[in-house]
């Protein structure tokens, strides 16, 4: 049933803006937020092993996080509010190493971003509050966690 539009984003290999099909009527709406078969057809046949959710106030900046070991691919979306989401390619040897892309994700638009393994990821809250949900391809490992400052000149 799930129909998704997958758009390579920012000219960065593996980074995808994802728009699910939303079925709306007088009662409200229904949508699939993930369907393994649809994602696999789009070349994104990853398996998610952990879901995380956060609530942040306006002006909060989270990130840019990554894990040196146990790298995580992430499918991220705002389930309330609006955020400016950023992914930075930190894959050594990548044609787009150091390149970043940002997109506004909102509960209203219901859009998502797939951030592949080997990227740093973060977001900035634009609305009064925002709830953020992300599916991960590997488990959180505090001993592997690292961060890049948002204003790092490199």
What are these regions (language model features)?
Residues 1-108, 127-129, 136-154:
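Non-catalytic, conserved peripheral segments adjacent to functional cores
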Residues 105-127:
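Conserved metal-binding segment of the jelly-roll/cupin
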